[in-house]
Structure formats: structure tokens, C-alpha cells
């Protein structure tokens, strides 16, 4: 009797051990799946808290109708201006408030070259400012300005995509606007953006503060160095000043890598900063350079061939010709 009881106890213990081992195996499998999913879906390029969290890390392509409304343009060209070249009061469809804004040299001619039914040029209206925390300039902080611009760009694309699901997109940005457009392009290319990646015809970023060697198409002449946000990523004091330097974009541009162009001039410390370009010990100079100030005439000259040109074309003309070709060859969705 005692022998039977011992056998029974051993059997129960064996079952318990087997169950525990199965639980461990299941936990390992779950951990591996989570790790693999994490590798497939890198975190958003947009700083935390700027956009509401999506329902899933990456979404599949949305179903599309065969037709869209007759009021929908075939293409929407979204332009994100640089610091001090936009405001929330600006009319996105008629941006006359800042007549010297760099990207008007692209969107203006495009609007003249194509009918409104073919392309809508949309300039993101946001508080494009950069507060120097060592001064009393009453400007919005870079973090808040960038967040506002990102939300405005995502809202514009989301609205257009909801109303016109067959419309394609061309994205351009300059300086702070290049960071914003690049972040949104990164999210789109990695399956987290406001539209599906196959709807984006192309992206061009001029003087991108998150420019990184080997990521996107570096349009020659392309200098060495990387964006200031990468060079200064490890300087935590800047975050406390409203100047978070976000480092490389996780996942790069994903599926949009081959469709994303980076234009940067030699000597522009915003997009081509050598490793020792900024001195955290000399904070005033660093902040002034980030604001496009000291030693930065290069940053303001992309409409001229003086510091950057491709076969004599300045950055704005190169971007205009590139965009014109994309729009000319873009799909012609059916309308009802």
C-alpha cells in the first residue's frame, strides 16, 4: 500500500515538473516572438508624446475603392518650411505670409505648372520657431515647435487620405521642416504613418538635422558628417532646455529609403556636423549655431548655387525638377 502511494506521489510530481517545464518553454517562445516583432517594428521616429499611440505598431495597407471624389487631387505636395518661415495663421493653400520662405521656390512653380486637379500644394502651418534659452526672445521652444509641426503635417495627410484614399504624396522639408518631414516619412516607411508607403511618390529633405550617412539617397555633392541631432544626441542638458536632440531615426526611412533624398551643403553644421562640431562646454555658441546663427551663412543659401549645386542647379531648382517629374508620372486615379 505504501509502495503504491509512493508511486502515485512520484507520478504527480512528474506531472508537475512537466507542467512547469512546459510553462518555461511557452514563456521563452512568447519572449522570442516579442523580440522578433520588436525587430520588425522599430520605435517611432517622432519623439514620444507628440502623436497619440496607434492601435498597432504597424498597420497593413488599408483597402481602397476603385474611384474617389471628383474634388480630390491626384497628388498632394506637402511642404514643411524651416524655422521662422511658417506660422499657425498661415493659409496652407496660399502661403503668402512669408514670401522669402525657401520652399516657395518649389511649391510656387509646381502650382503654376499643374492644374489643381492634378496637384494640390499644401504648406504646413505651424509655429516654426526656435527659443534660445539663454535669451528672452519669447520664441516657442524647439521641442514644442517641432511637435506642433509634426501634428499639423500628420493631420493634413490623415484628412486627405480619409477623403481621397487614392491620392499620392510628394513630401519636402527644409531645416526644422526637414526634420519633421523626415520623421513622418520614417514612420510611413516603417508602417506606422498616416498613409500607406506605396502612396508616397518621393521625399526630399534639405538640411535635415537628423541626416545620417547610408540612410536615404545622399544627393551629390554630399559632405561627410551627420545631422546636429545625431552629433548632439548624447548631450542631456539640451533636453532640459527644450532642445531634445533625438539621434538617428529608428528603422531609417524603411520602405521609403530608396525614395528619400537628402540634400546638404558642405559647411552646414545643421546637417553635416563633424563629431566635434559643437561644444557643450560653450553652450551659447552651440545654441546660436543650432538656431541658424553664428557661422551659418551656408544654411540660408540653398536657393543659390554658391554652397550646393548639382550641375549648376541649386537645391531648390533640383527639388523642383525632381518633383515635377514625379507629379508628371504619378498615377491618374479614377473619379466619380
Curated annotation (Swiss-Prot):
Major localization class: membrane
Transmembrane domains' residue ranges: 16-36
Biotechnology: The essential nature of the cell wall protein Culp6 makes it a promising target for drug development.
GO annotation (BP), single: lipid catabolic process
Statement: the UniProt record of this protein carries the keyword Cell membrane: yes
Region Disordered, residue ranges: 44-65
Name of the protein this chain belongs to: Carboxylesterase/lipase Culp6
Organism: Mycobacterium tuberculosis (strain ATCC 25618 / H37Rv)
Protein's gene: cut6
